[in-house]
Amino acid sequence: MTLTIGLTGGIASGKSTVSAMMRELGLPVIDADEAARAVVRPGEDAYRQIVAAFGPGILQTNGEIDRAKLGAIVFNNEEERKKLNAIVHPAVRQKMLAEKEALVRSGTKTVVLDIPLLFESGLTSWVDKVLVVYVDDDIQLRRLMERNGFTEEEARARICAQWPLAEKMKRADAVINNNGTREETRRQLLAILKQWDALEK
């Protein structure tokens, strides 16, 4: 029986760090952001639908979708954003589920689904255990400003667009506190995975 772990957190909470640690431990990680990039590549169904919906003006000279141009169209326009999400979200879900099913069929002991918006997208039914990566608000804000070059106002707006981390923690099966060092984070991760019997013997 395969154990499916849903890995999530807040923006700049250190989820990617934990995801990388899980890969290092030999766990297969299916990443929602990677899937979202894959489904909009030239030749994919979602790519064709996006070009049909938004016109060839969103393409770069090499035929790939210009994410900045598309982003500018959908960022401040709720209707356009809904139109894009209605194309991309089902394609991403289909891709992730297909990858998960293939791993389950091959008898993999544990599969990790790395989904930033696990709760917001209502996908908790996909997983057996939810692992939330947490940091204090001030650290989250500082990391986001440093990492993305955001002003404090921009960083706060990005954080507020997601569920509060405190709410995610309440619904989690386990929480990793990522305020400290990488080693402290790794220790917590190992303890949780051992408790869940998630690692190959």
Curated annotation (Swiss-Prot):
- Fetch the InterPro entries from UniProt: Depp_CoAkinase (IPR001977), P-loop_NTPase (IPR027417)
Please provide, alphabetically and separated by semicolons, the GO molecular function terms listed in this UniProt record: ATP binding; dephospho-CoA kinase activity
Record's keyword terms, sorted? ATP-binding, Coenzyme A biosynthesis, Cytoplasm, Kinase, Nucleotide-binding, Transferase
Which residues are in coiled coils? Answer: none
Q: Which domain of life is it from?
A: Bacteria
What the entry lists under Gene3D superfamilies is as follows: P-loop containing nucleotide triphosphate hydrolases
Q: Which residues are listed for ATP binding in this entry?
A: 12-17
Family, as annotated: Belongs to the CoaE family.
Name of the protein: Dephospho-CoA kinase
Organism from which the protein derives: Geobacillus kaustophilus (strain HTA426)
